[in-house]
Amino acid sequence: MTDTMSKAVIAIERPARWAKQLGSHLGHKIAVAEVENGWSFTIDGAYGEALATGENELTLTATGDTDELRQRMEFVLQKHLLKFAADHNPEVVWH
């Protein structure tokens, strides 16, 4: 079994704020840790990060033991970001 990884780079103002909001909210549901420039998230078999990678750039990453687990992490991060930042209408495209 190999890890699969994807990444989404989102243009959004105050990316550190959105990373922190994801960390604060998801910390009640899954394992969350503060990392350099953002937050990491762990669900059984999947790992993700929300990082402020530029002045107006938030990078989300998702890794999973399987494609299904990676997609689960993508879904969780994307769903919550789109909910929190709805007024900013961020475009999330995973690669």
Identify the meaning behind each predicted range.
Residues 1-18:
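Terminal, regulation- and interaction-focused segments at domain boundaries
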